[in-house]
Amino acid sequence: MMAFEQIPKKDWYSILGADPSASVSDLKQKYQKLILMYHPDKQSADAPAGSVEECIQKFIEIDQAWKILGNEETKKEYDLQRHEDDLRNMGPVDARIYLEEMSWNEDDHSFSLSCRCGGKYSVSKDEAEEVTLISCDTCSLIIELLHYC
């Protein structure tokens, strides 16, 4: 599935000091500024050993953050995983639905399902393959999207 499942959960955006809505060029600027600041070659030779090790660890984290957020594909996967984690933290799954049970909307190329509150669950065709949790656009209910094997 996603490469992020093996990596301990880290907020790569906060490591770069960026907002999740930041553009790739903004992320790159923050990365470049931080990577220079924490680069091992830029550290003072007379700095305490613990301080140097902390800088090296921070340098590695900044580099990892950029490798994930600087690549369009891995950034998309990471953002989807963050979104699903946020939904999981909102509460339990209300129902498990197969994609085939949802209605296809040709106008906006999305699948949708009515919620018991009158709102709807919707997911684009592209997202349908990747997301597993969908929130109602009106209330706090969440469904789990299942796929036939």
UniProtKB/Swiss-Prot annotation:
BP GO annotations: positive regulation of ATP-dependent activity; protein histidyl modification to diphthamide
Subcellular location: Cytoplasm, Cytoskeleton
Major place of residence: cytoplasm
Binding-site list for Zn(2+): C115, C117, C136, C139
Gene Ontology cellular component terms for the protein in this record: cytoplasm; cytoskeleton
Leader sequence residues: none
Segments crossing the lipid bilayer: none
Pathway annotation from the record: Protein modification; peptidyl-diphthamide biosynthesis
GO molecular function: ATPase activator activity; ferrous iron binding; zinc ion binding
A Pfam match: Zn_ribbon_CSL
InterPro entries with a match to the protein in the record: DnaJ_domain (IPR001623), DPH_MB_dom (IPR007872), DPH_MB_sf (IPR036671), J_dom_sf (IPR036869)
Sequence ranges assigned to domain DPH-type MB in this UniProt record: 93-148
SUPFAM superfamilies to which the protein is assigned, alphabetical: Chaperone J-domain, CSL zinc finger
Recorded superkingdom: Eukaryota
J domain mapped to chain residues: 11-82
Keywords of this entry: Cytoplasm, Cytoskeleton, Electron transport, Iron, Metal-binding, Transport, Zinc
Domain writeup: The DPH-type metal-binding (MB) domain can bind either zinc or iron ions.
Physiological role: Stimulates the ATPase activity of several Hsp70-type chaperones. This ability is enhanced by iron-binding. The iron-bound form is redox-active and can function as electron carrier. Plays a role in the diphthamide biosynthesis, a post-translational modification of histidine which occurs in translation elongation factor 2 (EEF2).
Oligomeric form and interacting partners: Monomer and homooligomer. Iron binding promotes oligomerization.
Recorded family membership: Belongs to the DPH4 family.
Name the UniProt record assigns to this protein: DnaJ homolog subfamily C member 24
Organism of derivation: Bos taurus
Gene name for this UniProt entry: DNAJC24
